[in-house]
Amino acid sequence: MSRRSIIEKKTIKSDPIYRNRLVNMMVNRILKNGKKSLAYRIFYKAMKNIKQKTKKNPLSILRQAIHRVTPNVTIKARRVGGSTYQVPVEIKSAQGKALAICWLLRASKKRLGRNMAFKLSYELIDAARDSGEAIRKKEETHRMAEANRAFAHFR
């Protein structure tokens, strides 16, 4: 029996302006080389741009975008008897949100545009409207999981 104690989950702090944990998760994923102030600047500029474009609350747009991109299932490679199967696995909401944020940021980096703030804002607006690269990634993952549903018993 293990003698290790149960590790407590770290609580995610909220950001200074919106006082929201999702915002802090997003900023931490934008972060590069420890430059958190730059990550905050990029994110807040993106939120300002969303407010100008949509005339709506940017925080609700962010929530809606993350909700629409969050996957229910993902696929894991599992090796059984010399062959590798793509096994569909249900994921928890926290992990789904983390994946959604990753996909949103990756899709916004691929976009053509002036700077990261503009690209991020347009990707968030598109995701809130159920279009864009991040939504396509979610649908592709769900399609793969559906196609490999026969291997679900390998979990």
From Swiss-Prot:
PROSITE patterns: RIBOSOMAL_S7. This is Small ribosomal subunit protein uS7c. Belongs to the universal ribosomal protein uS7 family. PANTHER family: RIBOSOMAL PROTEIN S7. Keywords: Chloroplast, Plastid, Ribonucleoprotein, Ribosomal protein, RNA-binding, rRNA-binding. It is found in: Plastid, Chloroplast. Coiled coil: none annotated. One of the primary rRNA binding proteins, it binds directly to 16S rRNA where it nucleates assembly of the head domain of the 30S subunit. Part of the 30S ribosomal subunit. SUPFAM superfamilies: Ribosomal protein S7. HAMAP family: Ribosomal_uS7_B (MF_00480_B). GO terms for cellular component: chloroplast; ribosome; small ribosomal subunit. It holds the Pfam family Ribosomal_S7. It comes from the Eukaryota. GO terms for biological process: ribosomal small subunit assembly; translation. InterPro entries: Ribosomal_uS7, Ribosomal_uS7_bac/org-type, Ribosomal_uS7_CS, Ribosomal_uS7_dom, Ribosomal_uS7_dom_sf. It comes from Physcomitrium patens (Spreading-leaved earth moss). One of its GO terms (molecular function) is rRNA binding.
